[in-house]
Design a protein with these regions (language model features):
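N-terminal [4Fe-4S]-dependent radical SAM core
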Residues: 1-58, 70-77
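A structural motif detector for beta-strand N-caps
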Residues: 39, 203-205
Length: 205
């Protein structure tokens, strides 16, 4: 386990204090900058990267915690905090420190990710495992199952994304697999069947 560093800084795009579709219950949703995917239907393309340094809002993990924890009374027993983006795993260490503070307060934590940064080299995986230990729920967005279709849609292969789903399942983490169904874009019947078969084979989904 790494030494706690609540002063680590993250690049924050926006903050939603009363989110109802970003995990179970009432939640605070934090949207971070940074994403390598270029999804044709992206809902938040402005989170890919700031167009100028002046648009980047930096906060320490402690500052973000202090801002979010004020809303804890609204979360009750089934709400909590969700970190989304962009792609939160781009700022993995920052999310880890933010969640470390949240877990000390007994807050339910969720990462909303497309999984693209996932890899199994030992250094990165050690850092990811630490985040995983502090995360109650992963919401994994599968854009397409077929690799060729995924490249056409996002500009990137999905081998590491599917590998992340397997890794989370093998480690017993709670995971929601989500898919955006866009008519004529992500509704290929064969691809949906493959995705369904993949989900059925994954425990804790």
């Amino acid at each position: 386990m790494s030494n706690p560093n609540p002063n680590i800084k993250g690049r924050i795009h926006s903050f939603e204090s009363f989110a109802l579709v970003d995990g179970p219950g009432v939640r605070c949703a934090v949207f971070l900058y940074g994403c390598a995917l270029r999804c044709k239907f992206c809902h938040n393309p402005d989170t890919w990267c700031p167009s100028s340094i002046s648009q980047t809002k930096e906060m320490t993990a402690r500052e973000l915690f202090d801002k979010a924890i004020r809303y804890k009374p609204y979360w009750k027993n089934n709400g909590g905090i969700t970190v989304s983006g962009g792609e939160p795993l781009v700022q993995l260490d920052f999310v880890t420190e933010f969640f470390r503070l949240m877990k000390k307060e007994g807050v339910h934590t969720c990462v909303d990710t497309a999984g693209q940064p996932f890899r199994r080299d030992p250094e990165w995986l050690d850092r990811f495992n630490e985040l995983m230990s502090l995360t109650d729920l992963f919401m994994l967005d599968l854009k397409q199952f077929d690799s060729k279709l995924h490249v056409e849609l996002t500009g990137k292969d999905n081998a590491n994304i599917l590998d992340m789903a397997r890794y989370l399942s093998d480690n017993g983490k709670e995971m929601w697999i989500r898919h955006v169904l866009v008519p004529g874009v992500t509704d290929d019947e064969n691809d949906l069947r493959k995705m369904s078969d993949f989900k059925i084979g994954r425990a804790h989904v």
